[in-house]
C-alpha cells in the first residue's frame, strides 16, 4: 500500500463512504481505575459523518492507494500542545477490515514523530465501537469523555465524544 499527500478535491471522493452501521454502543462508567467501557447491542442504524468544509491551513490530507485506487484517507494537523490531531480517517467500504485504517494510523504516528510532536489525539463517539477497538489495538488510550459535545445537535445528541491519545515513547503516559 502506498500513502501519499492528496489534494482536498481528491479526498472528497471518499466523503460518500464516511458512514457505518451501528450495531453496538459503549456505555461509559467511571471507576477508581478510570473509564470502564461495556458494550450494549442496539437496533442497527446508519451513522453518517457530516463533512465540515472549514479547511485548516495547518492540515495535510493523505490518501491510501492499492493498485492506484484510492481506498482510504487521513487528515492530520499539528496542535498547540505538541500533538498531531487526526481530524478525519475514512476507508472505502470495500476495503474496511483489511488493514487500511491500521496503516493510516501507523503513517500518522510516523508523521507526528517526523515533526517532533509528542503524540496524537483524535475524537470519536461511543457508537463507533469498531474504530475504538482499532485505536486501542494501535496503542491509543482513552483519555477523556465529553457528555455534552453533541447535546446541541438533535441528530447526534445521544452520542458521547471519546478522546483517544497515543504518546511516543519519549512522553510519559497520561
Swiss-Prot record:
Source organism phylogeny: Bacteria, Pseudomonadati, Pseudomonadota, Gammaproteobacteria, Enterobacterales
Record carries keyword Iron: no
Biological process according to GO: response to antibiotic
All copies of domain N-acetyltransferase, residue ranges: 20-170
EC nos: 2.3.-.-
Family: Belongs to the acetyltransferase family. GNAT subfamily.
Keywords: Acyltransferase, Antibiotic resistance, Plasmid, Transferase
Keyword Acyltransferase: yes
Reaction(s) this enzyme catalyzes, per UniProt: streptothricin F + acetyl-CoA = N(beta)-acetylstreptothricin F + CoA + H(+)
Pfam families: Acetyltransf_1 (PF00583)
UniProt organism field: Escherichia coli
Other known facts: Encoded in several related transposons, in encoded on an unnamed plasmid.
NCBIfam families: sat2
GO terms of molecular function: acyltransferase activity, transferring groups other than amino-acyl groups
PANTHER family according to UniProt: AMINOALKYLPHOSPHONATE N-ACETYLTRANSFERASE-RELATED, AMINOALKYLPHOSPHONATE N-ACETYLTRANSFERASE-RELATED-RELATED
Protein name in the entry: Streptothricin acetyltransferase
